[in-house]
């Protein structure tokens, strides 16, 4: 089942963001470092290109992502003309504090009290936009929470006389083109609970972990490498249920509860540092999709294309 979630408040948030875009200087596009392309909202790109606003791509939650893969993503993005990217974690306030300077480089004309730099934070739900704003402000002004759609309206605050920052509600888009993107977004808690089926999302996640991070699965759930080598995604969840004593009446494994355990463990980062996609897996997915009968011709990972004002960039892939 294709995952889609575009509740009414997102449509009004999109219209409001389009309006605000006229009165800001730089977009801080927050992506999830564990799934940078799947968490890239085409609406954000469309809105900022309409107004020709420069953009800093920030791969947030880098503390949860595989550092080697994050490094590959940063190199990948920074190779593209007009794209500036860095990775960070809101858990490291020192890294976040560098953002105004990096944004300033993208809009060098906005650099005094008369023309303060106006930054707009945009991104998918639950990616850490409000947390980022609170860290920059060094105050808990915006409400945050580990669920999608916590912020429902825009809020602009003055960082100091030279900088203002606007937090926006998380935005998805009306049609997520690739099923695996919907599943990655759902696994990472960017999709409303009613728009997904935990068991389906957890089965996708288990399959991905089995292929890419079997050692992390083995150590978290006390399964041997041999056991894992012989099972599929569904049986991984079954085994988690049995290891954790999650049973229904009659002794049958409680698949639903075990699915929730796996999803929560991934979201909390207790499995270890995991990236759901790499530049190479992204390209392979797009090639597969394009080869399907009637399949869309995929754009390669990243946006490519336009020249934007040059900025100094830093590559803090570790994010811890
Ligand atoms: N591990 C980790 N967690 C983070 C980071 N940044 C934010 N979070 C957590 O992510 C969750 C969502 O944060 P919010 O700031 O509410 O996210 P948001 O993008 O404003 O979400 P919406 O308002 O729903 O669109 C919270 O539980 C934060 O503590 C980070 O860099 N690392
Ligand atoms: Mg928020």
Feature-to-residue mapping (PLM):
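Structural beta-sheet core signal
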Residues: 29, 57-59, 121
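Glycine-rich phosphate-binding P-loop
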Residues: 119-138, 142, 168
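Short coil/loop residues immediately preceding or within conserved phosphate-binding loops
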Residues: 116, 139, 154
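Alpha-helical scaffold segments in soluble metabolic enzymes
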Residues: 98, 102, 131, 204, ...
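Helix-rich effector regions associated with P-loop NTPase G domains
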Residues: 1-27, 34-35, 40-55, 62, ...
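Short, well-ordered alpha-helical segments in soluble proteins
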Residues: 103-110, 125, 136-140, 148, ...
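Canonical P-loop GTPase G-domain recognition
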Residues: 63-122
């Amino acid at each position: 089942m294709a995952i889609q979630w575009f509740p009414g408040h997102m449509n009004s948030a999109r219209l409001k963001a389009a309006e605000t875009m006229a009165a800001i200087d730089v977009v801080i596009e927050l992506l999830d470092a564990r799934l940078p392309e799947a968490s890239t909202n085409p609406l954000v790109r469309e809105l900022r290109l309409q107004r020709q606003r420069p953009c800093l791509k920030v791969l947030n939650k880098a503390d949860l992502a595989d550092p080697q893969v994050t490094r590959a993503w940063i190199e990948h993005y920074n190779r593209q003309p007009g794209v500036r990217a860095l990775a960070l974690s809101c858990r490291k306030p020192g890294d976040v504090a560098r953002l105004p300077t990096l944004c300033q480089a993208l809009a060098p004309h906005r650099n005094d009290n008369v023309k303060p730099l106006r930054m707009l934070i945009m991104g998918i739900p639950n990616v850490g936009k409000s947390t980022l704003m609170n860290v920059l402000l060094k105050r808990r002004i915006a409400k945050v929470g580990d669920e999608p759609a916590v912020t429902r309206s825009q809020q602009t605050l003055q960082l100091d006389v030279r900088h203002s920052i606007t937090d926006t509600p998380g935005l998805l888009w009306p049609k997520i083109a690739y099923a695996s993107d919907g599943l990655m977004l759902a696994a990472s808690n960017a999709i409303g609970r009613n728009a997904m089926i935990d068991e389906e999302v957890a089965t996708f996640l288990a399959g991905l972990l089995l292929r890419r991070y079997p050692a992390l699965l083995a150590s978290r759930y006390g399964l041997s490498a041999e056991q894992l080598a012989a099972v599929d995604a569904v049986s991984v969840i079954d085994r988690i249920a049995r290891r954790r004593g999650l049973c229904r009446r009659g002794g049958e494994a409680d698949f639903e509860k075990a699915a929730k355990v796996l999803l929560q463990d991934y979201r909390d980062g207790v499995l270890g540092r995991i990236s759901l996609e790499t530049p190479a897996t992204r390209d392979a997915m797009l090639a597969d999709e394009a080869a399907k009968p009637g399949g869309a011709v995929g754009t390669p990972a990243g946006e490519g294309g336009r020249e934007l004002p040059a900025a100094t960039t830093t590559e803090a892939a570790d994010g811890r």
